[in-house]
Amino acid sequence: MSQSKADYINVIGAGLAGSEAAYQIAKRGIPVKLYEMRGVKATPQHKTTNFAELVCSNSFRGDSLTNAVGLLKEEMRRLDSIIMRNGEAHRVPAGGAMAVDREGYAEAVTAEIESHPLIEVIRKEITEIPDDAITVIASGPLTSDALAEKIHELNGGDGFYFYDAAAPIVDKATIDMNKVYLKSRYDKGEAAYLNCPMTKEEFMAFYEALTTAEEAPLNSFEKEKYFEGCMPIEVMAKRGIKTMLYGPMKPVGLEYPEDYMGPRDGDFKTPYAVVQLRQDNAAGSLYNIVGFQTHLKWGEQKRVFQMIPGLENAEFVRYGVMHRNSYMDSPNLLKQTFQSKSNPNLFFAGQMTGVEGYVESAASGLVAGINAARLFKGEDEVIFPHTTAIGSLPYYVTHAESKHFQPMNVNFGIIKELEGPRIRDKKERYEKIAERALKDLQTFIDA
């Protein structure tokens, strides 16, 4: 155990992880200096200066406890996550998923943090790793070059990276509603998605256009390394037609409504392929194209995506873009507390640690913030149970094989297995894992 003599803790970056870390520290009665460069220096992806901005999708993904990210969200709610609380307050319809009005949510997080009496917000770019106090670095995958260089020095000069992309957003008023229908897959939850059905002929023409469209160039010295969970649609398409039909354009569970009058293949009750649109703001005026992260040139996006039935005259309020994400060699550099092995006063959180996804990033900030606060108070740091979703993430990123380490979403495969004979039914098995996780988390909280 080591601790600083300073009477505050630094948090660098006010994204999901940094906002969560700052809140967790401050609620434990410790002053925080929260540094955020947006407002002074922009990033390629962020559109506002709000904290915890969502730059890719507006979805926090599945809400069911039989979904690992649903379990993680419930654990975070029980740990008083500022991200989850404000996300809940700004939900928009998304069937069985949790999606938010991205502007209202980010504005609420920003207002709560800026008004907190123990959090001092400093709009400034940090170019060196501070040594004046316990510090949580949560500068994100878009960390500025100067600070990224210092972090890479901790990596022994090695920088890991991958690319991910954001999906386009369209103005609902410009969608041809006669060609689409409202439905959630398998009718789960409320009918929350606009579905753009395709016949086989329409799909094949779209597929041909997508796979031959011109992509925006990458730097010539960088390989195209993508995170599977946010892969550009054109890259996915080049893997083959079935990748699309079993992936983002899967038609199963999205049968035509009885009053559907558009084109279809014969008497089939289900389209050959479906493109889904998900509500992106509380007003319901914007919709994003689900799973259509892309790196196509903007003119090509307009040409190809207007081939989607219902989007022939759609106005794109934001085109899809791709950005480079950097992450650390966490298995060699970090403890399960998200603490540096070489400097106990230094913590890291967010996607740079190798957790992937909004919820996972916020969860890492929660863990790092709690442990930074405990270190400040002279208490032992805590390791969350491996039987929980929030404990499985730091376990994974610090125990993975360094040579093949890549960012990871939360999933039941990284949570400690149940004891006893394996339960064959997947839903029942996941229910038991979730039940054990919440029980163990409560025991951990009460200890």
Swiss-Prot record:
| Cofactor(s) in the UniProt record | FAD
- Please indicate which superkingdom the organism of origin belongs to: Bacteria
Cysteine pairs forming cystine bridges in this chain are: none
EC numbers: 2.1.1.74
Its localization reads: Cytoplasm
Positions that bind FAD: 13-18
Q: What processes does the entry annotate via GO biological process terms? A: tRNA methylation; tRNA wobble uridine modification
User: Cytoplasm as a keyword?
Assistant: yes
Q: Which UniProt keywords apply?
A: Cytoplasm, FAD, Flavoprotein, Methyltransferase, NAD, NADP, Transferase, tRNA processing
GO cellular-component terms in the record? cytosol
| Alphabetized Pfam families for the sequence | GIDA
Catalysed reaction(s)?
Answer: uridine(54) in tRNA + (6R)-5,10-methylene-5,6,7,8-tetrahydrofolate + NADH + H(+) = 5-methyluridine(54) in tRNA + (6S)-5,6,7,8-tetrahydrofolate + NAD(+); uridine(54) in tRNA + (6R)-5,10-methylene-5,6,7,8-tetrahydrofolate + NADPH + H(+) = 5-methyluridine(54) in tRNA + (6S)-5,6,7,8-tetrahydrofolate + NADP(+)
Gene Ontology molecular function: flavin adenine dinucleotide binding; tRNA (uracil(54)-C5)-methyltransferase activity, 5,10-methylenetetrahydrofolate-dependent
Please name the HAMAP family in this protein's record. TrmFO (MF_01037)
In which family does this protein belong, per the annotation? Belongs to the MnmG family. TrmFO subfamily.
Its biological purpose: Catalyzes the folate-dependent formation of 5-methyl-uridine at position 54 (M-5-U54) in all tRNAs.
Q: What is this protein called?
A: Methylenetetrahydrofolate--tRNA-(uracil-5-)-methyltransferase TrmFO
- What organism is recorded for this protein? Streptococcus thermophilus (strain ATCC BAA-491 / LMD-9)
